[in-house]
Amino acid sequence: MYIFMFLLLKKANIFVSLLSIIKYFIMNKLNILFMSIFSLGLVHCYKPIGKNEKVTKQLSEVSQKKVVYQIFTRLFGNKETKNIPWGTKEQNGVGKFEDITDTALQEIKKLGVTHIWYTGVPHHALVGDYKYIGISDDDPEVVKGRAGSPYAVKDYYNVNPDLAVNPANRLAEYEQLIQRTHNNGLKVIMDIVPNHIARKYESISAPKGVQNFGQTDNSTVVFDVDNNFYYVPNQSFVLPKYENNYLPLGGEKHKMIDGKFEENPAKWTGNGSRSPQPNFDDWYETVKLNFGISPDGEKEFPQLPKGYENESYEKHYQFWKDKKVPNTWLKFKEIALFWLEKGVDGFRFDMAEMVPVEFWSYLNSAIKMKNPKSFLLAEIYNPKAYRDYIHKGKMDYLYDKVQLYDTLRNIVQRGHSTDGIAPVQEDLKDISSHMLHFLENHDEQRIASKEFAEKPEKALPAMVVSHTISDAPTMIYFGQEVGEEGAENAGFGSPSRTSIFDYIGVPSHQKWMNNGKFDGGQLSNNQKKLREYYKKLLNIDVKGKYIDIHHYNRKHTPFYKDKIYAFTRGEKGGKKYIIVNNFSSIESFDFQLQIPENVIKYWQLPEGKYALKDKLFESRSILQVKDNKGSIKINIKPLESFIYEIE
């Protein structure tokens, strides 16, 4: 009897235990499922803050905004600090490919950078003796500076010998840099300059069967569709008359400086001058390339059919496959494909608007067929041509210089009203993601120069606007993030811009470089703070629709002045941002920022309070929504910015 009862109880306990296990498993599975659904729901739902209610962070964005870091390769790794005007590379030093180390690349990547534009890599004209490896001398009278313009390319199938430890092995050293860059998770962009080349173009490195520019030209005529150059028949080239007390090499004696340069017949100059004697301010060190446009402007090549602005690059590629195109087009396609084979991920095209859009359709469709993810950037300054170069020319990105850059610079430098920002974005709203934003590059004056802002901190609100106002890529120029002034008298180059024509050191960059440690060891505290600001900002990826709230607040908000600029980004099912900037370097502002009804309705925010967190410095605030309108208490100091995210 007792044995029977014992066995019965034992079975019952086992049954109860089994039930407990099953219950535990089911409840935990349900909890896991519930928590998963709840967590996913948080990505797409916002709930007003209630009493004792915790704020849950959203999942981080998966995709990363493109950030380009422009390196002027000849200057980047240079440790020499003498900075003698017109100095030789032995005196003033020169950067090498090998100076761009894994450590340097990792520190650059930490800034939020995705792409590096290695500027000045193709072999260009320069004053130096490399005859021992088969390179002919360049005449200083048609070289700007001693180091030379990077946009007077002499050999498209090799790289600047100055950049190599072993100039005879220069191409291999560049390939190693490409691989090193890729190994550090970064993409490589390099220059192609289709509009013009050096007056003495001479490729000694071209693959077998590739002809030099002009090799088969008929130089007895001004124009032929298959000539690479335009000619001035029966007239020889004459050097320009120098101005402003200029002398080649600063007046230094040189065996090739004799007042003449042999070119007969003369060729048109790079900026389009048709005179056998260009002016001093012409691009006299270069010659204009012929893309099949006659001197009277006729296009002597096939035209894209109507509607092709809406077609894919694949369709453009198929269109050109059986078409006869000018010889110069063929040469540049060969050049681009050559560098793609070397591992380059994209190109920055110099003065792209001086070359017909049909050529870009031809070239860029071929590039995209080879590498659909290639990064294609055009230097262009004509807003009326923007859409053609994007849609017909298949450019990924264009310089946003004459609209956003100029507007922001005028606010920073000249105290212009921030009212000018919104009209720029309105004008570009259909192509805003195609516009590359920047506040510095090799052509522009340094922010920290006295000719621009003098103090680099004065441009930080502009940098915030530039980086966050759209999905466009952001570009910064090496040294910008540590307040480089570009104040040196380098020789040909003038102070305020870091010279691209001379051998020179870049002082603030050198302090960050710290003799190759790349740890900022010589930077001042202010420079360290500046770099940290850039690092925080460039790692922030703001997405979603841009809505201007500046003009609404100008009308409806007391104490909201035209030194402030506010806008929103975001989507109803995603992250939402309210961005506020104070461009004044002396005034603080205290006001109740209004979020108008169109934003609240677009975001579908119910009434209530919403926690805000600034992504720059983690300060907090509250968004109050009532009657389909929002408000935020803002107390903003001089040159301060908030990138508020609704948590």
Predicted regions and their residues:
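C-terminal motif of bacterial Sec signal peptides marking the signal peptidase cleavage site
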Residues: 43-44
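N-terminal structural segment of carbohydrate-active enzymes
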Residues: 49-187, 195-206, 210-225, 231-273, ...
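C-terminal beta-strand-rich structural cap/linker in extracellular carbohydrate-active enzymes
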Residues: 67-68, 623-647
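Hydrophobic faces of well-ordered beta-strands that scaffold small-molecule active sites
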Residues: 67-69, 116-118, 188-190, 347, ...
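Short, acidic/polar
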Residues: 94-108, 324-340, 459-463
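Active-site neighborhood of glycoside hydrolase catalytic domains
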Residues: 287-386
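Loop/helix patches that line or flank the sugar-binding groove of alpha-linked glycan CAZymes
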Residues: 438-441, 446, 450-610
